[in-house]
Amino acid sequence: GFTPFRIY
């Protein structure tokens, strides 16, 4: 879900 911690 594109955050600095997740690219999902």
Swiss-Prot record:
- Top-level taxon of origin: Eukaryota
User: What UniProt keywords apply to this chain's record, in alphabetical order?
Assistant: Amphibian defense peptide, G-protein coupled receptor impairing toxin, Secreted, Toxin, Vasoactive, Vasodilator
Gene Ontology cellular component annotations, sorted alphabetically: extracellular region
Indicate the principal place this protein occupies in or around the cell: secreted
Where in the cell is the protein located? Secreted
Q: Name one GO molecular function term.
A: toxin activity
Tissue-by-tissue expression: Expressed by the skin glands.
Annotated coiled-coil segments of the chain: none
Q: Which residues make up the annotated site Not sulfated? A: 8
The processes (GO biological process) annotated in the record are: defense response; vasodilation
Record's function text? Produces in vitro relaxation of rat arterial smooth muscle and constriction of intestinal smooth muscle. May target bradykinin receptors (BDKRB).
Q: Which family does it belong to?
A: Belongs to the bradykinin-related peptide family.
List the protein's name: Des-Arg1,Pro2,Pro3-[Thr6]-phyllokinin
- Organism, per UniProt? Physalaemus signifer (Girard's dwarf frog)
